């Protein structure tokens, strides 16, 4: 992958945690104690366990903190897409991916302090997604921009 495309990739932290009260608090407290800010997260339930996916301001450090705390943790390459916080913005992104035959595996979104909507996505072909989004003049944020949010 060429260097310019690598800079568009965000490292997402994923971890498995028991689906019981207090587990999210435990994870969040570990990150808080390490001075790591959670920018966005989602939880997917899977029976007795859940998958917590999050983007943070210090992904490598977060990975190490959680791993050494005994969590099963991994890093995943995702994209951060800046959208207008208006009806139809999600539809446009979905259409762009559909027309390019890029499968959207999962997504979660949040709104920044300055009222920009950001969509975090995992796709089946990240290089094709970057190329397609850039051709459509859709802004991708990188880790440095994410850290400032």
Model-derived regions, located:
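A conserved regulatory-domain signal marking ACT and ACT-like small-molecule sensing domains
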Residues: 1-149
């Amino acid at each position: 992958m060429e260097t310019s495309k690598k800079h568009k990739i965000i490292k997402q932290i994923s971890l498995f945690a028991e689906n019981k009260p207090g587990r999210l608090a435990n994870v969040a407290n570990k990150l808080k104690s390490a001075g790591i800010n959670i920018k966005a997260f989602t939880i997917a339930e899977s029976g007795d366990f859940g998958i917590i996916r999050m983007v943070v301001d210090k992904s490598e450090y977060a990975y190490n903190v959680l791993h050494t705390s005994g969590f099963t943790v991994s890093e995943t390459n995702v994209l951060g897409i800046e959208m207008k916080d208006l009806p139809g913005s999600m539809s446009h992104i979905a259409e762009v991916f559909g027309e390019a035959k890029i499968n959207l595996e999962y997504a979660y979104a949040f709104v920044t302090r300055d009222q920009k909507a950001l969509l975090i996505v995992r796709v089946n072909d990240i290089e094709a997604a970057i190329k397609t989004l850039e051709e459509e003049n859709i802004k991708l944020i990188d880790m440095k921009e994410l850290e400032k949010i």
